[in-house]
UniProtKB/Swiss-Prot annotation:
Native organism: Homo sapiens (Human)
Effect caused by changing residue 1067 to G: No effect on interaction with CBLC
Effect of residue 724 to S: Found in a lung cancer sample
Active site per UniProt: 837 (proton acceptor)
Name of the protein in its database record: Epidermal growth factor receptor
MF terms in GO: actin filament binding; ATP binding; ATPase binding; cadherin binding; chromatin binding; double-stranded DNA binding; enzyme binding; epidermal growth factor binding
Glycosylation sites: 56, 73, 128, 175, 196, 352, 361, 413, 444, 528, 568, 603, 623
Family: Belongs to the protein kinase superfamily. Tyr protein kinase family. EGF receptor subfamily.
Domain Protein kinase, residue spans: 712-979
Length: 1210
């Protein structure tokens, strides 16, 4: 059936419309786009002209569309042609009222502005709050990737009505930033016909076209209506006119003529008949989002069929059949380096002292090169030093730049651009300001010196403001340009007449095409002939060395085997066969240095020749198998070959060497056997082989308890890390009815041998100490996974304790803690132990009146002759360390004194961080400049001066721990004189009773037999029965029936055993532990118990009432009592170690915190120590009282690493 006339005419009209459209799609005008962001290019006029040049008649922008700094009354109508932007669209800092992006359909968002936005409209207003009013992007229907940002556009109308979820992908809606302000001017409302009142401006034509949110559920992408039959093909973007892939307004991925496709047609197809890849006649290259038959000029083709600006690292660029292609390198490629702004130089503005080394041996630069004034000044903000001019020679290997070359600064003492003397081609695939591929501005040079430059493929040239520059106007630039549209802008340089007056003109040997400088090697081309790169008057044809011949106006050296002729040519061409006369011998047509002798010839036969009197080589007789000296058999050598005798001699020498080697080996083995037998005999006879070298050091007689796994019970996990797990539990010694709260540290199954060694080293140190103020090891269990059993400190670390109770801590507590820490450190010094990690976090609180030093993971035991310890590395607490420890890794007892001063400062500031806000890498420099921690508000100058003495640069000038004990003991007797705390006399700390406390702590009901570890290890009178079945030895045994009975000191055998050790059960409620100490009495273990508190110091009249409830309670009750006896509200802190001034309080659940109970876990530098690892435990305390232990944000602990890192070497 024939179609009607009307239908046929319509069909012809449709075909006529489609054909031009198809051609138009293939021939769309493409432009590169810009990446200037908010940079202004010159004046407003220059900036606008640059924008106009880049986007005039442009339809597809391959990069970014940046419209910035456009002033009022500028005509932006050239932007109407833009339909597609591959990168982002930035509209910022404009005062023009209307930006007509009326035909923009899609923003692909292949690049983002500020890492998030595909469309950014920012600050388009002037001082009068007038500016951008209309942004009619009525055809914008899709943004494939990226979010949208509007900010500070007070005059912009109607945009707030747009339904962006129809345009932006749902993946990016959460990143949208919309700041629409109240309009100062009047805005016309949207046309009533607009759907949901959404429009880009007044009038029906500016209504928003919805192609997504109105679609039926059956549609997977865009649509042209609400019906299921209106769905667009899934290859369409921004809408469609029909259901097919050829009906798309814009293609989502690639456009092949009028059809949208997922990929472009491949260049090669597999032929199943021939089992080979054949050329696809329909194959096309992918260029942006378009399939093209041929890549645009100045682009290269990859093996994958893409048009790219530069080849990859494993390929090189070459021209084949008129097409520039990327070919895989055979072996190593010539070195291609990224340019400024790409890859590792993404954030660099210029070549500088820190990045120029990356250009070493580079032959091709993929991108641009900038040399700006900041390179030679240095940049204090980025800590970049000034560039050494000598390092510019690194760039002499560069032969190609794919982008542009910008030079705005150069060394004053260099007269030309010497670093680019080998540069051959500037491709200009990216241009400065979208225009220039070579820019040399404001330099002090006299000549360019680009003597190897042969091509500038694209882009203009600007050479301006170089007051001493000559020769630039002599160059025939058009011969270097790749296109006819390229231009030069050579202005404001030295005048031509001034150059001639000083003789700065091209050399006489240069041709009229100009020169790059004054030397013959600077000529663009030579007037006569050239030798290498240098122009010469003539070649060495008849005289001179070396002799040459002429080829294409170039002097070529004759072959070395050509004999120089007098007043005649030496050779006629290249190679040894073009010589007029040979220098040595003639072998056929060739000149050779010697006649062939034993050279492999045809049929695997050796060729031998001799030279006649005329120095001509002839073949030897066939029977002369080892050469000859003349023709015939008589020319053969009579002595026979020399090779067999040489071979025989070599074999004999090798056999002789072998025999000698065997003899030496047997002799050495015999000596070893004799020595071994002698050593065995001496050992059997128990004779000393070496002389005695006694050290004079006392033997370490510390006891190490080996516990069985059945003797302790794990109750609850305190924490875990890389080393293993820490439990709180009970130690129940075999055969004894006591329970001792302990912390159990268990290594993992797969723990490394190094971790096992380190934990045993720590066990050695902890087992070697025995002092009331040093945390000790109770025992070790050698199961398949090593387990350490240590004391359980109820109140956690002192740092957290002072932070939590800062409102209840009085001066007496603070000074007593200082005394106790000094006592513990003095004990460690006497035991030759350097702690290396003293800080408030490493002091544990047994009771509010009793603290102990812990964390021996870094402690080192000095030998008998050692005065200091040199560390090799690892994490160290920089902000607590002495200066010599930071700089030279030297640790002594006096470096511990420095740490003690910082620890005291922590206590006096109630847990403040030392040097807070100062990076650890800068601590050494500020200490060397004399800066120290400030005086805490509560400290008098007496206390602060002690801290300052601890921080002296000279280690010998710091006080000893013995002296610190005396100083702080004196202050502890009159605390309110030295520490000023508001409400000091009303402050008190909780001190729960043992049974209730441990029951709450251990979550156990049956805690009647609970005993503190110290009391078990040093038992008092009648405390235990110590049956004979106990396998755990006790030091002594005492018995006390009551507090008011007469006490006898009795050992296990029933004998009187006195005196009582310090901090013993009987002295638990003794007076001030500091006592009336002198330097001579510091080390006395047994001190007499004073009858009254602070009896050596007059009592303060106000607020200093002492609590005698348990202090020095007499063995027989006195008839009269102090009026404050058993006063629960007394504020006395007379006994600095053991106070019980308040009723028992509930145990805070903070005791479940691993940070408080884990005893610092294993002190290896690993996850097991929270002070050395961030985010190991949660930080905050919940309102219900359950405490989540704070992780140590210890930037103070740094491992050896580069300066840019948070870790620095110990």
């Amino acid at each position: 059936m024939r179609p009607s006339g009307t239908a046929g005419a319509a069909l012809l009209a449709l075909l006529a419309a489609l054909c031009p459209a198809s051609r138009a799609l293939e021939e769309k005008k493409v432009c590169q786009g810009t990446s200037n962001k908010l940079t202004q290019l010159g004046t407003f006029e220059d900036h606008f002209l640059s924008l106009q040049r880049m986007f005039n008649n442009c339809e597809v922008v391959l990069g970014n569309l940046e419209i910035t700094y456009v002033q009022r009354n500028y005509d932006l109508s050239f932007l109407k042609t833009i339909q597609e932007v591959a990168g982002y669209v930035l509209i910022a800092l404009n005062t023009v009222e209307r930006i007509p992006l009326e035909n923009l359909q899609i923003i692909r968002g292949n690049m983002y502005y500020e890492n998030s936005y595909a469309l950014a409209v920012l600050s388009n207003y002037d001082a009068n709050k007038t500016g951008l009013k209309e942004l009619p992007m009525r055809n914008l229907q899709e943004i494939l990737h990226g979010a949208v940002r509007f900010s500070n556009n007070p005059a912009l109308c109607n945009v707030e009505s747009i339904q962006w979820r129809d345009i932006v992908s749902s993946d990016f809606l959460s990143n949208m930033s919309m700041d629409f302000q109240n309009h100062l001017g009047s805005c016309q409302k949207c046309d009533p016909s607009c759907p949901n009142g959404s429009c880009w401006g007044a009038g029906e034509e500016n209504c928003q076209k919805l192609t997504k949110i109105i679609c039926a559920q059956q549609c997977s992408g865009r649509c042209r209506g609400k019906s299921p039959s209106d769905c667009c093909h899934n290859q369409c973007a921004a809408g469609c006119t029909g259901p097919r892939e050829s009906d798309c307004l814009v293609c989502r991925k690639f456009r092949d003529e009028a059809t949208c496709k997922d990929t472009c047609p491949p260049l090669m197809l597999y032929n199943p008949t021939t089992y080979q890849m054949d050329v696809n006649p329909e194959g096309k290259y992918s260029f942006g989002a378009t399939c093209v038959k041929k890549c645009p000029r100045n682009y290269v083709v990859t093996d994958h069929g893409s048009c790219v600006r530069a080849c990859g690292a494993d390929s090189y660029e070459m021209e084949e059949d008129g097409v520039r292609k990327c070919k895989k390198c055979e072996g190593p490629c010539r070195k291609v380096c990224n340019g400024i702004g790409i890859g590792e130089f993404k954030d660099s503005l210029s070549i500088n002292a820190t990045n120029i080394k990356h250009f070493k041996n580079c032959t091709s630069i993929s991108g641009d090169l900038h040399i700006l004034p900041v390179a030679f000044r240095g940049d204090s903000f980025t800590h970049t030093p000034p560039l050494d001019p000598q390092e510019l020679d690194i760039l002499k290997t560069v032969k190609e730049i794919t982008g542009f070359l910008l030079i705005q600064a150069w060394p004053e003492n260099r007269t030309d651009l010497h670093a680019f003397e080998n540069l051959e081609i500037i491709r200009g695939r990216t241009k400065q300001h979208g225009q220039f591929s070579l820019a040399v501005v404001s330099l002090n040079i006299t000549s360019l010196g680009l003597r190897s430059l042969k091509e500038i493929s694209d882009g203009d040239v600007i050479i301006s403001g170089n007051k001493n520059l000559c020769y630039a106007n002599t160059i025939n630039w058009k011969k270097l340009f790749g296109t006819s549209g390229q231009k030069t802008k050579i202005i404001s340089n030295r005048g031509e007449n001034s150059c001639k007056a000083t003789g700065q003109v091209c050399h006489a040997l240069c041709s009229p095409e100009g020169c790059w400088g004054p030397e013959p090697r600077d000529c663009v081309s030579c007037r006569n002939v050239s030798r290498g790169r240098e122009c010469v008057d003539k070649c060495n044809l008849l005289e001179g060395e070396p002799r040459e011949f002429v080829e294409n106006s170039e002097c070529i050296q004759c072959h070395p085997e050509c004999l120089p002729q007098a007043m005649n040519i030496t050779c006629t061409g290249r190679g040894p066969d073009n010589c007029i006369q040979c220098a040595h011998y003639i072998d056929g047509p060739h000149c050779v240095k010697t006649c062939p002798a034993g050279v492999m010839g045809e049929n695997n036969t050796l060729v031998w020749k001799y030279a006649d009197a005329g120095h001509v080589c002839h073949l030897c007789h066939p029977n002369c198998t080892y050469g000859c000296t003349g023709p015939g058999l008589e020319g053969c050598p009579t002595n026979g070959p020399k090779i067999p005798s040489i071979a025989t001699g070599m074999v004999g020498a090798l056999l002789l060497l072998l025999v000698v080697a065997l003899g030496i080996g047997l002799f050495m083995r015999r000596r070893h056997i004799v020595r071994k037998r002698t050593l065995r005999r001496l050992l059997q006879e128990r004779e000393l082989v070496e002389p005695l070298t006694p050290s004079g050091e006392a033997p370490n007689q510390a006891l190490l308890r080996i516990l069985k796994e059945t003797e302790f019970k794990k109750i609850k996990v305190l924490g875990s890390g890389a080393f293993g797990t820490v439990y709180k539990g009970l130690w129940i010694p075999e055969g004894e009815k006591v329970k001792i709260p302990v912390a159990i540290k268990e290594l993992r199954e797969a723990t490394s041998p190094k971790a096992n060694k380190e934990i045993l080293d720590e066990a050695y140190v902890m087992a070697s100490v025995d002092n009331p103020h040093v945390c000790r090891l109770l025992g070790i269990c050698l199961t398949s996974t090593v387990q350490l059993i240590t004391q359980l400190m109820p109140f956690g670390c002192l740092l957290d304790y002072v932070r939590e109770h800062k409102d209840n801590i009085g001066s007496q507590y603070l000074l007593n803690w200082c005394v106790q820490i000094a006592k513990g450190m003095n004990y460690l010094e006497d035991r030759r132990l350097v702690h290396r990690d003293l800080a408030a976090r490493n002091v544990l609180v047994k009771t509010p009146q009793h603290v102990k030093i812990t964390d021996f993971g870094l402690a080192k035991l000095l030998g008998a002759e050692e005065k200091e310890y040199h560390a090799e590395g690892g994490k160290v607490p920089i902000k607590w360390m002495a200066l010599e420890s930071i700089l030279h890794r030297i640790y002594t007892h006096q470096s511990d004194v420095w740490s003690y001063g910082v620890t005291v400062w922590e206590l006096m500031t109630f847990g403040s961080k030392p040097y807070d806000g100062i990076p650890a890498s800068e601590i050494s420099s500020i200490l060397e400049k004399g800066e120290r921690l400030p005086q805490p508000p509560i400290c008098t100058i007496d206390v602060y001066m002690i801290m300052v003495k601890c921080w002296m640069i000279d280690a010998d000038s710091r006080p000893k721990f013995r002296e610190l004990i005396i100083e702080f003991s004196k202050m502890a007797r009159d605390p309110q004189r030295y520490l000023v705390i508001q409400g000091d006399e009303r402050m008190h700390l909780p001190s729960p009773t043992d049974s209730n406390f441990y029951r709450a702590l251990m979550d156990e009901e049956d805690m009647d037999d609970v005993v503190d570890a110290d009391e078990y290890l040093i038992p008092q009178q009648g405390f235990f029965s110590s049956p004979s079945t106990s396998r755990t030895p006790l030091l002594s045994s005492l018995s006390a029936t009551s507090n008011n009975s007469t006490v006898a000191c009795i050992d296990r055998n029933g004998l009187q055993s006195c005196p009582i050790k310090e901090d013993s059960f009987l002295q638990r409620y003794s007076s001030d532990p500091t006592g009336a100490l002198t330097e001579d009495s510091i080390d006395d273990t047994f001190l007499p118990v004073p009858e009254y508190i602070n009896q050596s110091v007059p009592k303060r009249p106000a607020g200093s009432v002492q609590n005698p409830v348990y202090h020095n309670q007499p063995l027989n009750p006195a008839p009269s009592r102090d009026p404050h006896y058993q006063d629960p509200h007394s504020t006395a802190v007379g006994n600095p170690e053991y106070l019980n001034t308040v009723q028992p309080t509930c145990v805070n659940s903070t005791f479940d915190s691993p940070a408080h109970w884990a005893q610092k876990g294993s002190h290896q530098i690993s996850l097991d120590n929270p002070d050395y690892q961030q985010d190991f435990f949660p930080k905050e305390a919940k309102p219900n009282g359950i405490f989540k232990g704070s992780t140590a944000e210890n930037a103070e602990y740094l491992r050896v690493a580069p300066q840019s890192s948070e870790f620095i070497g110990a």
